[in-house]
C-alpha cells in the first residue's frame, strides 16, 4: 500500500474520532438541556418550549451517543471476520439511520418555522452531519481493506 494511501486512511480515522466526539457532545448537550460556562451558553439543538416530544429528543440524544461509541471501535484490530462483518453491517444501518435523523430534523424545523410564519434557516449543520455520517461507511471499509482503493 502506498504511503499516501495509508496516510489518508489515518486522516479518515481521525475524522471518525472527531465526529464521534462531536456526536457525544451533541447527545450530552441535548440530555442536560444546554451548557452554561460563564458567559458562554450553548443551547440545546431543540427549543424545549417548541418541541412537545421530549421522549423522542432523549432517544435521539442516546442514539447519538451510541452511534459515537460505534465509531470508536478499533475497526482495524478486529480479527474475527464474522464479528467485523456484523459490526460493519450495524455501522451501515446506524449511519443510514443517522442520515435519516438529520433529514427528519430539517423537515421538522421547516414545519415549526412554517407554523410560526417564519422562514426556516438553511440546514448547513445538518447537511454536514449527514455527509459525515454517511462517510463513515467507506472510511471503515477502506481502513479494513485498503486494497479496494486501488
Model-flagged regions — what are they?
Residues 21-62:
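Hydrophobic transmembrane helix segments
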Residues 86-105, 126-132:
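Hydrophobic alpha-helical membrane segments
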Residues 35-39, 103-112:
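Juxtamembrane "helix-exit" motif on the non-cytosolic side of transmembrane helices
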Residues 5, 69-93:
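Juxtamembrane helix-break-helix junctions at the cytosolic face
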Residues 112-125:
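Non-cytosolic membrane-interface motifs at loop->transmembrane helix junctions
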Residues 1-25:
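Cytosolic juxtamembrane helix and N-cap/initiation of the first transmembrane helix
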Residues 127-149:
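Membrane-water interface at the C-terminal end of transmembrane alpha helices
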Amino acid at each position: 500500500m502506498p504511503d499516501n494511501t495509508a496516510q489518508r486512511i489515518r486522516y479518515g480515522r481521525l475524522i471518525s474520532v472527531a465526529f464521534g466526539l462531536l456526536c457525544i457532545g451533541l447527545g450530552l448537550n441535548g440530555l442536560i438541556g444546554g451548557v452554561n460556562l460563564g458567559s458562554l451558553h450553548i443551547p440545546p439543538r431543540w427549543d424545549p418550549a417548541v418541541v412537545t416530544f421530549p421522549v423522542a429528543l432523549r432517544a435521539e440524544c442516546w442514539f447519538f451517543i451510541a452511534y459515537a461509541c460505534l465509531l470508536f471501535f478499533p475497526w482495524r484490530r478486529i480479527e474475527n471476520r464474522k464479528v467485523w462483518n456484523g459490526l460493519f453491517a450495524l455501522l451501515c444501518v446506524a449511519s443510514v439511520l443517522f442520515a435519516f435523523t438529520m433529514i427528519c430534523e430539517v423537515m421538522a424545523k421547516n414545519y415549526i418555522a412554517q407554523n410560526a410564519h417564519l422562514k426556516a434557516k438553511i440546514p448547513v449543520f445538518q447537511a454536514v452531519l449527514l455527509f459525515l455520517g454517511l462517510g463513515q461507511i467507506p472510511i471503515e471499509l477502506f481502513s479494513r481493506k485498503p486494497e479496494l482503493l486501488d
